[in-house]
Each structure stands twice: as C-alpha cells, then as structure tokens.
C-alpha cells in the first residue's frame, strides 16, 4: 500500500481536505495584492515644480511664468525657469519671451490629486532625480521574496510545512502593518522586504501542504484552484485600490487580515507525508487517524497501526533523513537535470510576467481597468491550461504556455506605438499565457522532486523566479536605447526556455516520488517506453512498404 492508498483509505477528498484547502488558499487572495501593490501605492500622478512662494501671482499666471512646456504643451515635470518668463508684467515691471534658462525643481512639486491623492511617490517626492527609488522599493520587495524562498523552503523541510506557514502569516501581518505606518522611505523598504520574505514562504508551503494531502487524481485541480484564487486576488486589488486610494490605508487593508490567518492556521494538520519522510511514524499515524475522524472514516482510521504504516511506507522509513539542502539537487545527474531545466522555466516565467504587470501606467488607459483586464484574462487562460494539464500532460502545457507568451510579446515589439488596442490585446494574451505557465510550473515542480527535497526544490525554483522579477525592471531601462528593446528581451527569454521542457519527464497520473530512486526509476520507465514506441514504429515501416 502506497501513501496515496492511505489517503484514499482515510477519505480521499473528504471534509478535511475541503476545509483545509479552502483555509490555506484564502490568504492567496491578498498575496496577489501584495505582489503588485506598488502599481497603486507607488503610482506617479501628474506633477510639476512648485513655483516660489512669494510671487503673489494667481496659479495660472504662476504656471505660465515659471514652468517651461514639454512637446505636448504641458508643464514640464522636472524643470522650472530660473526667473519668471512670458506673460503679463510681473511685480518688477518686466516681462520676457520665455526663452530663459531652466533648473531642476528647488521648492518641491505639486501633484495632481485626482486619481492618486496619496502615494509613496507624493509623500516622499520619488520623482525626477529620485524616480529610481520607486523601482528600488519594488526590487527590495522582490529581494525579500528571493530570500524567503531560500530560507523558508529549507525550514519547511526541517521544521514542517505547518510551523513555517504559521510563522509566515504572523510576519506578513506585522511587517505589512508596520509598512503602513513607516515614517520614512528606508523604513518602508525594510518592512516591504520582510513582507516579501514571508509571502514567499506562504506561497511555497501553501502549495506543498495542499498537494501532499490530496490523492493523485486531484492534484491538478488543487493547483488550478490556487491559480484561480490568485487571479481573483487581482480583481480584488483593483476594486479595493479604487475604493481606498490613499496608500497607507490600502497597505493596512491588505495586511491586517493576516492576523486572522495566523490565528486559524494553528488548527492546520501537518503533512503526514512529511512526517513519514522525516521518520516520525507515530505522528504520521496520529495525523492520518485525525483526518479519518474528520472525514467520517473512524473505522478505517482505527484499522491503521504502526505495523500497517511500516509495511506501507517502507521506502520513506529507509530514506536518508539527513539531506534536504539545496546541494542535494546537484548530487546526482537526474536531479541535476531537473534542477537546471526547472530553474530556467521559473526564471523565464517570472521575468516576462513582471515585465508586463508592473508597468500598468504605460498602457495609457485607466490603471484600474488594466488591472481588471489582466485579472480577467487569467480565467480562460488557466481553464485552458487546466484542460491541457489533465488531458495532454504537464510537459506540453508548460511548453505551449511559455512559447505562446513569448511569441505574443515579440509581436508586440514590432507593432507601432499608436496601435494601442492591438498592443494591449497582445500584452493581455501574453500575460494570460504566463499566468497559465505559473499555474503549471508550481504543480509540475512539486510532482517532479522527491518528498524529502520537494520543498527545497520549490524554494529554489521560486528563488530563480525572484531573480527574474528583480532583473526584469532593469531590462526596462534598455528602452532608452531602443523603445521596443525590452519587449524583444521579454519575449525571447520564454521562447528559449520553452525548449527545456523537452528534457523533463511527464508526471500525468504518476504517484509522487518519495526517493531519488523513485525519480531515477520513473526516468528509466519512460526511456523504455520511448524505446518500445520507436521499435514499434520501425516495425510498421516495412509493413507499410510491402502493402
């Protein structure tokens, strides 16, 4: 009897699985909000230099006198005249023709309070020469996500999924709330970094805890459900940000609920598969019996014993318990191949994804509308991805999603700038494909790695994804060399990465591997199957020729 049979014996997808999966994925609604929160909390409203305070002129006259105009006739954002220019006679009785010298803003800025009455940009003047600090805040958040993926991926293998998840909920609640009260920009960045760390841990432990409590035939459904909840969170962010335009209130609103998640997470049941892989057979038995009781399978739970578990989980009990570090991924050729290929897939997906979703103001339409559209496209994209995952397999779904996303982005690079509808449609389609790719890669990675390094593998994959999200904003700076250069790079990377899926095995309908030997055996079985198919094809060729 394998572990999957034990899950079926205690109820399969019963009341426990339904309740725990719901409670575990609920925080993902707000995790999506945190990842793209800076689209709203760091939005840049229209702005211009503040004229000198002692001019005694009306506002319109001040703008005419002190501010040069850009190519579209609007007041310049970052420059002002060194002395008052054209217009009616000024207090000193002079007037000029508007050709005076300019200088950077020296008295601060005036911001248009219409759409964004309060953001970190308006509060700390992150414009003009300080504009790069806005991107720094998002990059530091992604650095936190990278650190969290490495640290909490390792801790989840050593301490368990449940303990790490509880810690991450508390850290997100505290750091997110403190960020809302940050007195200055450095303190804000520090708390955002801590939030990124904990949210990475939540993402990894959420997927692993759910997958390890679900039977084989339902794992794809759970992975797709998690993806849909994340997409729903993007809808939620658009509505909440529209209703709560002030950044401190918005930051608070998406952080305080994690205190509630922290409280109810104490009632989660630790993964019995992790217990068994850690050699804690007594706790494995207690966890399975508790789940059987919740699922109404008391007799089946009572029939379980230490002897039954020893016979059923012999492989897990004989595994090497001491190795769960990242170096284990490079220890043998089969794991090394998995690690390198999956790392490329994680990097490419995140790199292209954040290249699109973190520049919503660049579309020239309502930022709230674009946020809703980007969330809406995930629904059909992930549905199609789910159907492909369950019918054709994980490998073709992963390859197709990355390839199509890259092609859409590359085409967007050659579409004229004035074709805004076409460019937006291609960006939305590409974003949908990347969302489907994220959905698949989480599930695919969890199914490829053996139990004792599964969380480490997910952590390292997420680490490479975060590297992609950190590098992505830097690539946008190449637009100064050529406007479409970022799109060409964002598109070429996923197209190239899609080829790596050809080196990965298919996991559709396969049990989760518990040991490295299981991974090697799976690869040998697939090689034998491919060899048999090739021999059958060779045998069919002479028959067709003779016919």
Swiss-Prot record:
Give UniProt keywords alphabetically: Cell membrane, Glycoprotein, Membrane, Transmembrane, Transmembrane helix
Pfam families according to UniProt:
Sugar_tr (PF00083)
For this UniProt entry, which segments traverse the membrane? 10-30, 136-156, 165-185, 196-216, 225-245, 249-269, 338-358, 369-389, 396-416, 424-444, 457-477, 485-505
InterPro entries associated with the record: MFS_dom (IPR020846), MFS_sugar_transport-like (IPR005828), MFS_trans_sf (IPR036259), Orgcat_transp/SVOP (IPR004749)
Give a GO cellular-component term: plasma membrane
Q: Which molecular function terms from Gene Ontology are attached?
A: alpha-ketoglutarate transmembrane transporter activity; antiporter activity; organic anion transmembrane transporter activity; prostaglandin transmembrane transporter activity; sodium-independent organic anion transmembrane transporter activity; solute:inorganic anion antiporter activity; transmembrane transporter activity; xenobiotic transmembrane transporter activity
**Signal peptide start-end:** none
- Which ranges sit in the Cytoplasmic compartment? 1-9, 157-164, 217-224, 270-337, 390-395, 445-456, 506-547
- Extracellular-side stretches of the chain, per the record, are 31-135, 186-195, 246-248, 359-368, 417-423, 478-484
State the annotated membrane topology for this chain.
Answer: Multi-pass membrane protein
Please list the GO biological process terms of this entry: alpha-ketoglutarate transport; organic anion transport; prostaglandin transport; renal tubular secretion
> What processing steps or modifications follow its translation?
Glycosylated. Glycosylation is necessary for proper targeting of the transporter to the plasma membrane.
Stretch list, region Disordered: 511-547
Q: Quickly give the catalysed reaction.
A: (6R)-L-erythro-5,6,7,8-tetrahydrobiopterin(out) + a dicarboxylate(in) = (6R)-L-erythro-5,6,7,8-tetrahydrobiopterin(in) + a dicarboxylate(out); L-erythro-7,8-dihydrobiopterin(out) + a dicarboxylate(in) = L-erythro-7,8-dihydrobiopterin(in) + a dicarboxylate(out); L-sepiapterin(out) + a dicarboxylate(in) = L-sepiapterin(in) + a dicarboxylate(out); prostaglandin F2alpha(out) + a dicarboxylate(in) = prostaglandin F2alpha(in) + a dicarboxylate(out)
What this chain does, per the record? Secondary active transporter that functions as a Na(+)-independent organic anion (OA)/dicarboxylate antiporter where the uptake of one molecule of OA into the cell is coupled with an efflux of one molecule of intracellular dicarboxylate such as 2-oxoglutarate or glutarate. Mediates the uptake of OA across the basolateral side of proximal tubule epithelial cells, thereby contributing to the renal elimination of endogenous OA from the systemic circulation into the urine.
Additional free-text comment from the UniProt record: Involved in the renal transport of a variety of drugs with well-known nephrotoxic potential, therefore may play a role in the etiology of the drug-associated nephrotoxicity. Uptakes the diagnostic agent PAH/para-aminohippurate and clinically used drugs. Mediates the bidirectional transport of PAH/para-aminohippurate.
Q: Which family does it belong to?
A: Belongs to the major facilitator (TC 2.A.1) superfamily. Organic cation transporter (TC 2.A.1.19) family.
UniProt protein name: Solute carrier family 22 member 6
Name its species.
Sus scrofa
């Amino acid at each position: 009897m394998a572990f999957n049979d034990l899950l079926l014996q205690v109820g399969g997808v019963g009341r426990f699985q339904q309740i725990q999966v719901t409670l575990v994925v609920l925080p993902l609604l707000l995790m999506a909000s945190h990842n793209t929160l800076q689209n709203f909390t760091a939005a840049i409203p229209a702005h211009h230099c503040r004229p000198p305070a002692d001019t005694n002129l009306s506002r319109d006259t001040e703008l005419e006198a002190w501010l040069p105009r850009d190519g579209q006739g609007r007041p310049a954002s970052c420059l002002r005249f060194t002395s008052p220019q054209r217009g009616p006679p000024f207090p000193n009785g002079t007037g000029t023709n508007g050709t005076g010298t300019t200088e950077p803003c020296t008295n601060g800025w005036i911001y248009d309070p219409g759409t964004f009455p309060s953001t970190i940009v308006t509060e700390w003047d992150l414009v003009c020469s300080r504009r790069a600090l806005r991107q720094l805040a998002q990059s530091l958040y992604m650095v936190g996500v990278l650190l969290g993926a490495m640290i909490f991926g390792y801790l989840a293998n050593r301490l368990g999924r449940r303990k790490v998840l509880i810690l991450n909920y508390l850290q997100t609640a505290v750091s997110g709330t403190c960020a809302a009260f940050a007195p200055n920009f450095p303190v804000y960045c520090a708390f955002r970094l801590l939030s990124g760390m904990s949210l990475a841990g939540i993402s990894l432990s959420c997927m692993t805890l759910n997958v390890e409590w679900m039977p084989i035939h339902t794992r794809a459904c759970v992975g797709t459900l998690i993806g849909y909840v994340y997409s729903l969170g993007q809808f939620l962010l658009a509505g909440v940000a529209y209703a709560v335009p002030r950044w401190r209130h918005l930051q608070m609103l998406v952080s305080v609920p994690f205190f509630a998640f922290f409280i109810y997470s104490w009632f989660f049941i630790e993964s019995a598969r992790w217990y068994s892989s850690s050699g804690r057979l007594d706790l494995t038995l207690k966890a399975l019996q508790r789940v059987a009781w919740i699922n109404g399978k008391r007799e089946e739970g009572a029939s379980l014993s230490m002897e039954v578990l020893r016979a059923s989980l012999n492989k897990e009990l004989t595994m090497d318990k001491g190795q769960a570090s990242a170096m284990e991924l490079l220890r043998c050729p089969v794991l090394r191949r998995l690690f390198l290929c999956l790392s490329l897939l994680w990097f490419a997906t995140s790199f292209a994804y954040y290249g699109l979703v973190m520049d919503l103001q660049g579309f020239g339409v309502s930022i709230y509308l674009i946020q809703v559209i980007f969330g809406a496209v995930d629904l059909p994209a992930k549905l199609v991805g789910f159907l492909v995952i369950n019918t054709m397999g994980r490998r073709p779904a992963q390859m197709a999603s990355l390839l199509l996303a890259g092609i859409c982005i590359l085409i967007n690079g050659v579409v004229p700038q004035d074709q805004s509808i076409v460019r937006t449609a291609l960006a939305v389609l590409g974003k949908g494909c990347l969302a489907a790719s994220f959905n698949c890669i989480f599930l695919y990675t969890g199914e490829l790695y053996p139990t004792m390094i599964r969380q480490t593998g997910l952590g390292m994959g997420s680490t490479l994804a975060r590297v992609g999200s950190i590098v992505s904003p830097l690539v946008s700076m190449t637009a100064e060399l050529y406007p479409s250069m970022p799109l060409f790079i964002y598109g070429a990377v996923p197209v190239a990465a899609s080829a790596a899926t050809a080196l990965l095995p298919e996991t559709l309908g396969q049990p989760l591997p518990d040991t490295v030997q299981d991974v090697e055996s799976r690869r040998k079985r697939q090689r034998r199957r491919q060899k048999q198919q090739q021999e059958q094809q060779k045998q069919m060729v002479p028959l067709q020729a003779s016919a």
